[in-house]
Design a protein with these regions (language model features):
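Hydrophobic micro-packing sites on short alpha-helices
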Residues: 53-57, 67-68
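Short C-terminal boundary/hinge segments that cap the last helix of small helical domains
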Residues: 61-71
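Alpha-helical residues within the helix-turn-helix
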Residues: 18, 29, 58
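A short, Lys/Arg-rich alpha-helix, primarily the initiator
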Residues: 1-19
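Short alpha-helical DNA-recognition segment
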Residues: 21-40
Length: 71
């Protein structure tokens, strides 16, 4: 069951990132995150920390709660 949330969260992050037009590499660099780590977040393979969730939200210019919409 937990994996479902990680996958859904990753899909939401990917959807929002793609709306910015940025590649994973450019977005990860912009927020100070390793690209392979960020890729694994989008793939639903990481149980990400709150600090990194906030970095992603700030980079996407959305609220943290927006990242969890429809989960």
């Amino acid at each position: 069951m937990n994996d479902e949330y990680l996958i859904a969260f990753g899909q939401r992050v990917r959807e929002l990132r793609q709306q910015t037009g940025l590649s994973q590499e450019k977005f990860a660099l912009m927020i100070g995150m390793d690209r392979t780590y960020f890729s694994s977040v989008e793939a639903g393979k990481r149980n990400i920390s709150l600090i990194n969730i906030k970095k992603i939200a700030d980079g996407l210019e959305v609220s943290v709660s927006n990242l969890f919409e429809n989960l």
